[in-house]
A protein has these predicted regions:
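Glycine/serine-rich phosphate-binding loop and adjoining beta1-alpha1 elements at the start
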Residues: 1-35
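N-terminal Rossmann-fold NAD(P) dinucleotide-binding loop
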Residues: 45-46
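Short glycine-/small-residue-rich Rossmann-like dinucleotide-binding loops
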Residues: 121-122, 150
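Conserved N-terminal Rossmann-fold NAD(P) cofactor-binding segment
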Residues: 67-115, 125-130
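Conserved acidic E/D residue at the C-terminus of a beta-strand in Rossmann-like folds
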Residues: 56-67, 71-72
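Rossmann-fold NAD(P)-binding glycine/threonine-rich loop
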Residues: 127-176
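Conserved N-terminal Rossmann-fold NAD(P)-binding element of oxidoreductases
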Residues: 38-40
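Gly/Ala-rich phosphate-binding loop of Rossmann-like dinucleotide-binding domains
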Residues: 49, 53-54
Length: 176
């Protein structure tokens, strides 16, 4: 039937799109991501850390400006893990692994070997530009700075960067 042909066409087109990297040059390959840094332990930063530790199973270094903020972020992550444990969607062992993947810090210790830093602080251009400069000072030259901004132009945030080509936008919409 025509409907069946259209449904099959949609299926094959969707499958083909999943395989498309968006880069025409086959010599260009993605770099591996082994460790993530997250700036800001608020609701968004903690949610990004939780999703990264649980779904991607990557270690996350979570930084905030004060211990109270870090503790709130870690408590939020723990509540999310506990909820999954209660629903038996993960085991106690898996819950422990997820919790251990997120390590807190008040400074940039542990950021020297992260592949991507995701910034999840409030919408303040000068703050985000300062964070770009700090990340470049404490991380590898290849580290990607991914801003989670929803309203500021990425180009303006990248103006403070020594390596603006490493500044990207990566918006999470309610990660949990």
């Amino acid at each position: 039937t025509p409907q069946a042909r259209q449904l099959m066409s949609i299926y094959f087109a969707t499958t083909a799109l999943k395989k498309d990297s968006g880069v025409a040059d086959p010599a260009v390959q993605p770099r591996p991501v082994r460790k993530i840094g997250v700036l800001g332990a608020g609701l968004m930063g903690a949610g990004i850390s939780y999703v990264t530790a649980g779904k991607a199973q990557l270690p996350v270094r979570l930084k905030d400006q004060d211990a109270a903020g870090l503790n709130r972020g870690l408590a939020y992550i723990d509540r999310l893990v506990q909820k999954r444990l209660y629903r038996r969607s993960i085991t106690a062992f898996e819950a422990g692994q997820e919790r251990r993947r997120v390590t807190p810090t008040l400074d940039f210790s542990g950021f020297q070997n992260v592949d991507v830093v995701i910034e999840a602080v409030f919408e303040d251009l000068m703050l985000k530009q300062r964070l770009v400069a700090e990340v470049e000072a404490h991380c590898l030259p290849t580290t990607i700075f991914a801003t989670n901004t929803s309203s500021l132009p990425i180009a303006q945030i990248a103006e403070a960067a020594q390596r603006p080509e490493n500044v990207i936008g990566m918006h999470y919409f309610s990660p949990v």
